[in-house]
């Protein structure tokens, strides 16, 4: 039941096309419709609703912010735990062994001195200090390795988490503009309905060619199609005329290029990758492949004569590889850094080329918007001037021509709103290309 009511409400709000073909038209009715529409348009144009251009809402929403903060805190906690593990790695290690010699139990023919030199079992414990594999050797680099790996994962995750904000911003901006564009088209459609009615009446009286009527009918069909696409689920009937304040967008290109080179997520990811390669290069050294372990050992022996003897000793245990692969590893890491830089330079070059195209488009749209704003201003003045002329025209005047004047003004407004929408979408495309989350410092909109 609730679903049926909801569908009924949507149906009431949705746009439905108007009559295309009229019958039994009368001259007085057609003229009355013209006069009513002229009066309505004069009232609407003299009392418009002034609105600012829709704002590009690109900032992260509350859910995005909460998710990113939670993920960041988890990465930072992970880094802290892993670095604490590195700091607790002091290199101390205890080893021990216990073993017996069964042959010592059966060999009883030897003299006491010889039996004293043999033993039935042995217990040995050793405390060693593995210096190289501890926090005391390159501890800073080992902690950096953990931190950089987590920072890279965090940035890559943040880039994935924020990937959809640009599509959402474009959809929101388009929806806002579509409402204003749709209301203008709806007013233009009201004009076309009356003109279509007049042309059909004139065609019935053989006072006009079929071409003019077909042209108006086609314009009417196109307008209805546009409304059905732009505002299919919104009620735009009987709306005021929304006058959007024309504006110009200024771009701080220096800040934009700086953002691409240094501040964007992609730039920070590349920076972290280079830092990882630098840090790995420091960790790749010959000493790091060796093993040097000072130790203290205590041994207890159960001799063949059933006596216990103890002894302790200290020493250094070491292992030195007879090969050294680290110079090649460092060269490989330097090559990897060059690959990262080369790939980044190529990406930046392509991004800047795309951005330059979009910047040129924004500049052209700024000029086109200024031109349309001038046309709207001049047409409005012309309509005001002609309104008094029509009132004083005692011999009558061409109603169709006057309706064309109003329709021309509406068409110019429609064009300007579409140009402003396209400019906003171009800005979003730039922000998407260079990973901008806040455009306040780079893009500035000023009223003309």
Regions found by a protein language model. Give the residues of each.
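Acidic, low-complexity, intrinsically disordered peripheral segments
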Residues: 2-60, 233, 245-263, 410-448
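Amphipathic alpha-helical coiled-coil segments and their boundaries
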Residues: 20, 27, 57-67, 71, ...
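A subset of solvent-exposed loop/turn segments in beta-rich extracellular surface proteins, enriched
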Residues: 30-58, 99-156, 192-193, 197-198, ...
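Gram-negative and organellar
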Residues: 43-74, 83, 105, 205-208, ...
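A glycine-/polar-enriched beta->alpha junction
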Residues: 61-68, 72-96, 101-145, 158-162, ...
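Charged, solvent-exposed structural "stalk/scaffold" segments
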Residues: 142, 146-149, 153-228, 367-438
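Acidic, serine/threonine- and glycine-rich low-complexity intrinsically disordered segments
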Residues: 200-204, 208-325, 339
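Intrinsically disordered, low-complexity segments enriched in Gly and acidic/Ser/Thr residues
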Residues: 271-281, 297-410
């Amino acid at each position: 039941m609730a679903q049926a009511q909801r569908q009924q409400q949507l149906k009431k709000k949705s746009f439905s096309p108007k009559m295309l073909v009229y019958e039994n038209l009368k001259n007085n009715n057609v003229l009355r419709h013209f006069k009513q529409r002229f009066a309505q348009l004069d009232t609407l144009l003299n009392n418009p609703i002034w609105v600012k251009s829709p704002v590009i809402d690109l900032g992260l929403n509350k859910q995005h912010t909460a998710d990113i903060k939670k993920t960041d805190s988890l990465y930072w906690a992970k880094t802290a735990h892993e670095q604490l593990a590195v700091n607790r790695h002091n290199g101390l290690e205890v080893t021990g062994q216990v073993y017996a010699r069964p042959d010592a139990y059966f060999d009883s023919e030897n003299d006491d001195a010889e039996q004293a030199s043999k033993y039935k079992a042995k217990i040995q414990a050793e405390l060693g200090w593995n210096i190289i594999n501890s926090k005391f050797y390159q501890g800073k680099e080992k902690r950096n390795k953990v931190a950089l790996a987590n920072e890279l994962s965090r940035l890559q995750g943040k880039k994935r988490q924020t990937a959809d904000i640009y599509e959402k911003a474009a959809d929101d901006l388009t929806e806002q503009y579509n409402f204003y564009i749709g209301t203008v088209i709806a007013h233009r459609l009201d004009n076309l309905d009356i003109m279509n009615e007049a042309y059909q009446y004139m065609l019935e009286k053989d006072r006009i060619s079929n071409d003019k009527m077909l042209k108006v009918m086609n314009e009417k069909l196109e307008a209805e199609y546009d409304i059905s696409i732009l505002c299919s689920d919104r009620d735009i009937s009987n709306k005021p005329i929304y006058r959007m304040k024309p504006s110009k967008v200024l771009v701080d290109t220096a800040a934009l290029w700086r953002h691409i080179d240094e501040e964007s997520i992609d730039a920070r990811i590349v920076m972290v990758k280079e830092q990882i390669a630098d840090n790995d290069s420091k960790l790749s050294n010959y000493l790091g492949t060796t093993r040097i372990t000072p130790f203290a050992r205590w041994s207890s022996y159960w001799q063949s004569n059933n006596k216990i003897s103890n002894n302790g000793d200290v020493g250094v245990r070491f292992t030195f590889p007879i090969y050294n692969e680290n110079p090649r590893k460092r060269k490989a890491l330097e090559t990897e850094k060059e690959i990262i830089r080369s790939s980044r330079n190529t990406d930046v070059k392509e991004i800047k080329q795309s951005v330059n195209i979009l910047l040129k488009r924004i500049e052209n749209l700024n000029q086109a918007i200024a031109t349309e704003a001038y046309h709207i201003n001049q047409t409005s003045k012309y309509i005001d001037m002609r309104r008094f002329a029509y009132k004083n025209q005692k011999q009558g005047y061409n109603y169709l021509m006057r309706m064309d004047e109003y329709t021309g003004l509406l068409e110019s407004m429609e064009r300007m709103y579409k140009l402003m929408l396209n400019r906003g979408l171009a800005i979003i495309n730039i922000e998407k290309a260079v990973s901008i989350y806040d455009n306040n410092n780079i893009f500035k909109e000023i009223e003309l």
